[in-house]
Regions:
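Conserved S-adenosyl-L-methionine
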Residues: 212-222
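A short glycine-rich, Lys/Arg-flanked "PGG" loop and its adjoining helix->strand segment in the class I
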Residues: 158-173
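Conserved N-terminal segment of class I S-adenosyl-L-methionine
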Residues: 1-138, 144-148, 161, 283-288, ...
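A structural helix-start
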Residues: 112, 154-158, 178
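Short, glycine-/aromatic-enriched active-site segment of Class I SAM-dependent methyltransferases
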Residues: 174-196, 200-205
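A C-terminal cap/extension of S-adenosyl-L-methionine-dependent methyltransferases
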Residues: 2-24, 52, 224-301
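A short His-aromatic
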Residues: 149-153
């Protein structure tokens, strides 16, 4: 049984009952540890939920599908502990639960509001709220960490990555996705509280510096990247001429681009891309995707 650390304000160790946590005589739905919402808040969760068609946006669906495929390579048995960091509205949690019903799945976020909603929709998944940089989990306790679009919301991303390394068991894997191409950082990223976008080379170097071994490196959104890049460059040119309200309107328009029909077409393109991506990595795209491994012993470089 997974042992959760005692949250602040309590003396006894929490026990997961299958529907909630028992701490002494008290039952709680979520374990709440440290909170840091400098790079995310409840309003952004609601905004993304509304504008991205409740998890049906083509790039989000493709990201989740890619993550589940990577999980297939590392998921082992019913004792496998999978931690999703940044569960937000819970779409990936649901898909992992369906795809890997025998695993021990834990959801988490840096703020409690989305977790409270997940606990009502999916009461059978233990949920914990904490700041990744100050992660309360013990060393070597998790087999797989999945963090999609998380690191860009954390100011000290290297410290966050080191925490992921720390809590992984030797031989464990981390599946990471982040926005690609640092030169395309614009007001869209600012409004979504991204501290940065990433270049694949720099992300890989930081990961290796934290002790990881690189298992896979690729990009998502390779086929549609030229159009995406053009839009981002236009945003950078418009930045000085738009007020906050105009930026919000522009972001909503870009997220909803083309409506449901175009969204379905682009998802079909992403499916084709994911199929080809089984045999070859993509050198550029909308998102960087890394699968990292914590080695069993010291690395010789």
């Amino acid at each position: 049984m997974f042992k959760f650390p005692t949250p602040p304000g309590y003396e006894k160790e929490p026990v997961w009952t299958g529907r909630d946590f028992q701490i002494g005589s008290e039952k709680v739905a979520i374990l709440k540890y440290t909170q840091c919402n400098a790079g995310w808040d409840a309003d952004l969760t609601e905004f993304h939920e509304k504008e991205a068609e409740a998890g049906n946006h083509y790039i989000d669906r493709a990201s989740r599908l890619y993550a589940c495929r990577e999980l297939e390579k590392s998921e082992k048995d019913q004792n496998t502990v999978i931690l999703e960091i940044g569960s937000s509205s819970g779409y990936l949690l649901r898909e992992i639960k369906i795809s890997f019903p025998e695993s021990y799945l834990i959801g988490s976020d840096c703020i409690p509001e989305p977790l409270e909603k997940i606990s009502e929709k999916m009461p059978g998944i233990p949920l914990i709220q904490f700041d990744l940089v100050n992660c309360p989990l013990p060393d070597n306790c998790v087999d797989v960490v999945v963090a999609l679009n998380v690191l860009e919301h954390i100011k000290d991303d290297e410290a966050a990555l080191k925490q992921i390394y720390r809590i992984l068991k030797p031989g464990g894997h981390a599946i990471i996705e982040v926005p690609a191409n640092s030169q395309l950082y614009d007001f869209y990223d600012e409004q979504l509280k991204h501290f940065r976008r990433y270049d694949s080379r720099g992300l890989k170097q930081m990961s290796l510096g934290c002790g990881f071994v690189l298992s896979k490196s690729t990009h998502l959104g390779f086929c549609i990247y030229p159009a995406f890049k053009l839009i981002k460059l236009q945003n950078k040119r418009k930045n000085k001429h738009l007020d906050s309200n105009q930026k919000q309107i522009t972001i909503k328009t870009q997220i909803r681009f083309g409506g449901p029909i175009v969204n379905r077409i682009l998802f079909t393109v992403m499916l084709f891309e994911l199929y080809l991506g089984k045999t070859m990595p993509y050198p550029w795209g909308i998102r960087c995707a890394l699968t990292l491994k914590k080695p069993h012993g010291p690395i010789t470089r």
